[in-house]
């Protein structure tokens, strides 16, 4: 691509370590696909906009410039949350926490029996976790201000609540986690839950297939819950993570590329994807699911609210990425080499730069 030879359609999500999609966003190198939403799905009578579930083309993940136009098509959605061994909790007689106070109580009970409360595959998995936490702490208004780096937002009570919860959770995390929290060894952290060496981990529905062949404790069965409410009676949130497909602005066959993107939402394509465990964000898709997936995709039917969106894009700043500023320091919080205040100070400093370079 550096030589100017672009594929017509790219399926590559944001949030990857190499941040290729983010580079294309920051460089304004992605084609506007707003008109695809009004196209008729090839071979069908419905328009693309009539098939995609509500809200999925109204977020900063699909409309990164805040100009009301869609540049990235939502693909393969997955409700994210805290995954656990439901069989182990049943065996112990422990209830799934619905508030963070209940979570800390459970952490103390588990510690007394030799099990840690928490682990995580890599710090990258804190994106969905932190987004849902921000919604739980302050609702959509706080989330929107925070993800646009509003001046003073990290000094608010809602922000402090988020920082305090993550820092406290770090103290309940299996200490081996940071050493394995990389792209080569992350499944070893996921294995901690299967072996009852940690109760909860943030993850997405793909975890079942990813760990399908892994050994597990007797009586293991997957469970998934939304993030606990900040206080009793508060809302619990589950972040909906989804991948993105997009068309490079330099694509040679732009019209054909748009037709192909429209086809990705056809019943035929959705069925093919679902056979591989990839679920398109189209209306009514959960009706056709069974087993673990039916449980996972019904999380919003069980009282959890959906959180969507992410940090606003900004022009390239050397050495500054959302993940390195907000999420990577969690490893150091767990190991004790970084304090909560150092983490917060880093976020404030970087947010000033991000705000100054935000892509409007």
What is the meaning of each model-derived region?
Residues 32, 206-213, 227, 231, ...:
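Mature extracytoplasmic/periplasmic domains
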Residues 17-79, 104:
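Hinge/lid segment of periplasmic solute-binding proteins
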Residues 22-23, 115, 129-133, 137, ...:
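Extracytoplasmic/periplasmic substrate-binding proteins
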Residues 60-75, 80, 104-152, 189, ...:
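Extracytoplasmic/periplasmic solute-binding protein
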Residues 147-148, 238-239, 279-284, 298-355:
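C-terminal capping/gating helix-and-loop segments adjacent to ligand/active sites or protein-protein/ligand interfaces
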Residues 106-110, 148-181:
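Glycine-centered hinge/linker elements that transmit conformational signals in sensory
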Residues 1-20:
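Early extracytoplasmic/lumenal segment of secretory-pathway proteins
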Residues 31-52, 138-161, 213-217, 229-237, ...:
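Short, solvent-exposed loop/beta-turn-alpha elements that line the ligand-binding surface or hinge
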